[in-house]
A protein has these predicted regions:
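Transmembrane-helix exit segments and adjacent C-terminal regions of multi-pass membrane proteins
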Residues: 1-7, 207, 365-450
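Transmembrane-helix bundle of Major Facilitator Superfamily
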Residues: 1-175
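12-transmembrane solute porter fold
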Residues: 4-29, 36-50, 55-66, 71-74, ...
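Hydrophobic alpha-helical transmembrane segments
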Residues: 77-82, 106-116, 137-147, 172-184, ...
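C-terminal membrane-cytosol helix-exit motif in multi-pass small-molecule transporters
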Residues: 165-186, 437-445
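Juxtamembrane transmembrane-helix termini
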Residues: 177-184, 221, 306-310, 444-450
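Short extracytoplasmic/periplasmic juxtamembrane "stem" segments immediately C-terminal to an N-terminal membrane anchor
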Residues: 349-367
Length: 450
């Protein structure tokens, strides 16, 4: 591999990590919740702070990016990202972690704003730079939860940020090897207004991805009871399908690929909304549909928005800000929606659990103490998590009595079904966002999709 290729790879990986950071800590949230004295809302800010700060800073940078050198933007961003990653790994309180994640968001905005012109310079052309930047960003967004889950399971949550530090360091070194001679004097030109329909579609698709990258991950961990690395294996269907979509996208007209991607993403989210309890095969298929949709729609849409006349730096910065703004707004709506549905789902689960025990073919002398133990376990379990009934059923004789074991199996299945259904409205909300993305794609597509 040539020196130039190594420099391109270093910057591309940094771009992928900056996009992955939107969701990379999702599978680590249970460990963070247990590690720090905080609330569920506090832990959620570990995700929200990064995305919110990145969105705000990227949108603000659109107004000033034409006064800066791309090398300087990239170097400053990677340096901040590097320092913030180390601070995240060393954080000993939830407040410090959220503050460090906010600085990461600022660094990510600068990194992503400067990386595209640098990739164009290193790659030999603007078109090649756009292609590399788009592919890295799409794959990074898709692989985030799986990568974070694997690192959390193999080491602990701090490993997520330890891993990011050398990536940022390599990108920082790469900035000194790129030669972007001119200052990016590319203000808010008319060409930026022509990207509005495409950016609206990207914002809606990014919001829809909340269902896949956040809600779907929480479902397989908290409801299905998978470990972080098992969850990582399941959600790895998303980046795998995203890569598989690449040759298909190349073979289709751009407008067809983008519209098909939005439809497939919506279909995958509808599939997640109607999961038949903890069916991993059905879940994998739904994740794969979402990944195919992501791979077909987002790269083509991003490439279209960034192409054409006008400077790429302002357009890339605007696109980054809009994408993360869509994600933050979807989180702001979807998270409270899910929280309310989980409370209602917990009540339904208790009623259904009572019915299972009453209908069970076991003696009344076993039912009464078992029902009391089950009630206590349900009260103690966090909303959205399936309690561990093993001890209660072991005491009731599940190891030797097939009837008691059958009640246990029926109970777990009933509660899983009730809690899984609690996710349905949130998944359908995200599917609606993907479907709404078809409006700018179909209405304005002929004007800006080649």
């Amino acid at each position: 591999m040539t020196r130039r290729a190594l420099l391109v790879a270093a910057v591309a990986v940094a771009v992928a990590v900056a996009f992955a950071d939107s969701s990379i800590v999702v599978l680590a949230l249970p460990e963070l919740y247990a590690r720090f004295d905080t609330t569920i809302e506090g832990v959620a800010w570990v995700i929200t702070s990064y995305n919110l700060v990145l969105a705000i800073c990227a949108l603000a940078l659109v107004l000033v990016v034409h006064h800066a050198r791309a090398n300087l933007l990239l170097a400053t961003g990677t340096l901040l990202f590097l320092a913030a990653s180390i601070a995240c790994a060393l954080a000993d309180s939830i407040g410090l972690l959220i503050a460090a994640r906010s600085v990461q968001g600022l660094g990510g905005a600068l990194l992503l704003a400067g990386s595209l012109p640098v990739l164009g310079a290193l790659g030999g052309s603007t078109a090649r730079g756009i292609a590399i930047w788009t592919l890295a960003g799409t794959f990074g967004a898709a692989v985030g939860p799986a990568l974070g889950g694997a690192l959390t399971q193999l080491f602990d949550w701090r490993a997520i940020f330890v891993f990011q530090a050398p990536v940022a360091g390599a990108a920082l070194l790469a900035t000194f090897g790129a030669h972007v001679a001119a200052i990016l004097r590319e203000g808010w030109r008319p060409s930026l207004w022509r990207t509005v329909p495409g950016n609206v579609a990207l914002a809606l698709l990014s919001g829809a991805l909340v269902g896949t990258l956040f809600l779907g991950v929480l479902l397989v961990i908290d409801v299905f009871g998978l470990t972080p690395i098992q969850g990582a294996a399941v959600v790895s269907a998303i980046p795998a399908a995203t890569l598989l979509a690449r040759p298909l996208a190349a073979a289709l007209p751009a407008a067809v690929a983008i519209a098909s991607g939005a439809v497939l993403l919506a279909a995958g989210l509808v599939g997640l909304a109607f999961l038949p309890s903890s069916d991993l095969g059905y879940t994998l298929a739904s994740f794969a549909l979402c990944g195919l949709g992501l791979g077909l729609a987002v790269p083509g849409l991003t490439h279209t928005v960034l192409g054409g006349e006008g400077g790429i730096a302002p357009k890339a910065t605007l696109t980054v800000g809009i994408r993360h703004l869509g994600l933050v707004l979807a989180l702001a709506i979807g998270a409270p929606l899910l929280a309310g549905d989980l409370v209602a789902g917990a009540d339904v689960a208790k009623l259904n659990a009572t019915a299972v025990i009453i209908d069970g073919e076991i003696p009344a002398t076993t039912k009464i103490p078992l029902a009391l133990d089950i009630r206590d376990e349900l009260e103690r379990a966090p909303k959205g998590e399936i309690p561990d009934f093993a001890a209660a059923f072991e005491e009731a004789g599940a190891g030797t009595d097939d009837a008691v074991q059958q009640v246990h199996d029926d109970l777990v299945e009933t509660i899983e079904r009730a809690v899984t259904r609690s996710f349905r409205p949130s998944f359908l909300f995200c599917a609606l966002l993907a479907a709404l993305a078809l409006v700018p794609i179909l209405v304005f597509g002929r004007r800006w999709v080649a």
